[in-house]
UniProtKB/Swiss-Prot annotation:
The keyword Transcription does not apply. Phosphorylation on Tyr-15 by ABL1 and FYN, and on Ser-159 by casein kinase 1 promotes kinase activity. By contrast, phosphorylation at Thr-14 inhibits activity. Phosphorylation at Ser-159 is essential for maximal catalytic activity. GO terms for cellular component: axon; cyclin-dependent protein kinase holoenzyme complex; cytoplasm; cytosol; dendrite; filopodium; growth cone; lamellipodium. The lineage of its organism: Eukaryota, Metazoa, Chordata, Craniata, Vertebrata. One of its GO terms (molecular function) is protein serine/threonine kinase activity. Inhibited by 2-(1-ethyl-2-hydroxyethylamino)-6-benzylamino-9-isopropylpurine (roscovitine), 1-isopropyl-4-aminobenzyl-6-ether-linked benzimidazoles, resveratrol, AT-7519 and olomoucine. Activated by CDK5R1 (p35) and CDK5R2 (p39) during the development of the nervous system; degradation of CDK5R1 (p35) and CDK5R2 (p39) by proteasome result in down regulation of kinase activity, during this process, CDK5 phosphorylates p35 and induces its ubiquitination and subsequent degradation. Keywords: Acetylation, Apoptosis, ATP-binding, Biological rhythms, Cell cycle, Cell division, Cell membrane, Cell projection, Cytoplasm, Kinase, Membrane, Neurodegeneration, Neurogenesis, Nucleotide-binding, Nucleus, Phosphoprotein, Serine/threonine-protein kinase, Synapse, Transferase. Belongs to the protein kinase superfamily. CMGC Ser/Thr protein kinase family. CDC2/CDKX subfamily. Its EC number is 2.7.11.1. It comes from Mus musculus. This is Cyclin-dependent kinase 5.
Length: 292
């Protein structure tokens, strides 16, 4: 650890404590993520180490770069590039108003990062505004990519804060264990709606049951025809047959018609029907968008 000088604690992440630090040789500012390991554990699971070392190969401008992995018997510290703030803090500072072009730019960058990782068979599985980081140039970067695979999908933060269910798709809420890239696309849809509403979450459920009710009240409870595999999921239980909201106009009033169409394609209850990151980037919503 002598290579890095800790400057300040930034916060408690899902997996441990995060510090702002400086590389003593290059003076580069980095984020140190100290991963907490269970006391009764034999140190770092080799599977976790393998996964994490793969993440060093994910090099893309919309992915937070993992510079280094420091590993001692009981400690694992991940050294990431430093970003000024996350999307949640950004929402707090924009006072309920977000320029439609910024919404489009952030979603485009989110999809670019997702498409890159998905093409390499890496899923995020725990996307939310807190792990979308934004730097001073308005560049959005996905953080904590692949950590859910290395350490397991978090059920609660180690700081006892409950991990949010707000961005989890219905198939996962019904106990699906086989994930595909579609898990991240649902989360991207929830984040898109939150961007369009300048930080108001789309489905702020209190627990799994409340979460599913909120989703079905908006999108309609899926029938067996619409989603044949639903009733086979481990935690499936029937819900009232809520009708779908006819239009998303009232849900995301500031989003134009093509934006609403893209949102509907992301928020499909049946994971098979969800649009992919590559398909989403080709959607007409982006036809007039010039990437910086």
């Amino acid at each position: 650890m002598q290579k890095y000088e800790k400057l300040e604690k930034i916060g408690e992440g899902t997996y441990g404590t995060v510090f702002k630090a400086k590389n003593r040789e290059t003076h580069e500012i980095v984020a140190l993520k100290r991963v907490r390991l269970d006391d009764d554990d034999e140190g770092v699971p080799s599977s976790a180490l393998r996964e994490i070392c793969l993440l060093k190969e994910l090099k893309h401008k919309n992915i937070v770069r993992l510079h280094d992995v420091l590993h001692s018997d009981k400690k694992l510290t991940l050294v990431f590039e430093f970003c000024d703030q996350d999307l949640k803090k950004y929402f707090d500072s924009c006072n309920g108003d977000l320029d439609p072009e910024i919404v489009k730019s952030f979603l485009f960058q989110l999809l670019k990062g997702l498409g890159f990782c998905h093409s390499r068979n890496v899923l995020h599985r725990d996307l939310k505004p807190q792990n979308l980081l934004i730097n001073r140039n308005g560049e959005l970067k996905l953080a904590d990519f692949g950590l859910a695979r290395a350490f397991g999908i978090p059920v609660r933060c180690y700081s006892a804060e409950v991990v949010t269910l707000w961005y989890r798709p219905p198939d996962v809420l019904f106990g699906a264990k086989l994930y595909s890239t579609s898990i991240d696309m649902w989360s991207a849809g929830c984040i898109f709606a939150e961007l369009a509403n300048a930080g108001r979450p789309l489905f702020p459920g209190n627990d799994v049951d409340d979460q599913l009710k909120r989703i079905f009240r908006l999108l309609g409870t899926p029938t067996e025809e619409q989603w044949p595999a639903m009733t086979k999921l481990p935690d499936y239980k029937p819900y009232p047959m809520y009708p779908a909201t006819t239009s998303l106009v009232n849900v995301v009033p500031k989003l134009n018609a093509t934006g609403r169409d893209l949102l509907q394609n992301l928020l499909k209850c049946n994971p098979v029907q969800r649009i992919s990151a590559e398909e989403a980037l080709q959607h007409p919503y982006f036809s007039d968008f010039c990437p910086p």
